[in-house]
Amino acid sequence: MCTSLTTCEWKKVFYEKMEVAKPADSWELIIDPNLKPSELAPGWKQYLEQHASGRFHCSWCWHTWQSAHVVILFHMFLDRAQRAGSVRMRVFKQLCYECGTARLDESSMLEENIEGLVDNLITSLREQCYEEDGGQYRIHVASRPDSGPHRAEFCEACQEGIVHWKPSEKLLEEEVTTYTSEASKPRAQAGSGYNFLSLRWCLFWASLCLLVVYLQFSFLSPAFF
């Protein structure tokens, strides 16, 4: 039974994608708020997503904020004999920095973000549980809003000792290209206009003023002789 709309969406996307990736095996997704990093039972594998994008809503003061550093922990186990697998998942919460309450708030995510994160999970699952080449991990840099620096004192994952690393080196080249081209558009547009305060233009205007003064002096100078 789903405890929230986001939980239902996670399970829906996971089951649909696993049906395509591994149709011969049965997999389940369990939300476990008590999951601990690196505390694994025998045979279990771990995948840690450190750069998810989510929106938080304070249940006390109604403040909302966006974060591009949502941490999600997955523990995975495959029983090859039974052809059944299990994934336990924990989305780490954040504290509201506006009201200062000690209440931890959950994040909500767009379906498109969940789909990309499930793709990452399946990539890791194929590598660790099936010993296959899972391919490249997806990190949606271009779709992330600028939410400012990460504030570790309000992050549940940071308080439990999880260090935020930079995006994975397996970032898809086409996503980097898309992000770079999109980010360069405003700069290119801004650079296409004339900056009349630049050094080049200042020198031009100074030279023009000197020329005007020189011409005026040249025309007026015969009157003094």
UniProtKB/Swiss-Prot annotation:
Swiss-Prot/TrEMBL keywords: Cell membrane, Membrane, Metal-binding, Transmembrane, Transmembrane helix, Zinc, Zinc-finger
Cited Pfam families: Zn_ribbon_3CxxC
Summary of the tissues where the protein is detected: Expressed in circumvallate papillae and testis.
Chain ranges on the Extracellular side, renumbered to this chain: 220-225
UniProt signal peptide: none
InterPro entries: R-trans_p, ZAR1/RTP1-5-like_Znf-3CxxC
GO CC terms: cell surface; plasma membrane
Transmembrane annotation, as ranges: 197-219
Subcellular location: Cell membrane
Cytoplasmic side: 1-196
GO BP field: detection of chemical stimulus involved in sensory perception of bitter taste; protein insertion into membrane; protein targeting to membrane
GO MF annotation list: olfactory receptor binding; zinc ion binding
Zn finger intervals (3CxxC-type): 52-161
Bilayer disposition of the protein: Single-pass type III membrane protein
PANTHER family: RECEPTOR TRANSPORTING PROTEIN (PTHR14402), RECEPTOR-TRANSPORTING PROTEIN 2 (PTHR14402:SF18)
Family per record: Belongs to the TMEM7 family.
Name of protein: Receptor-transporting protein 2
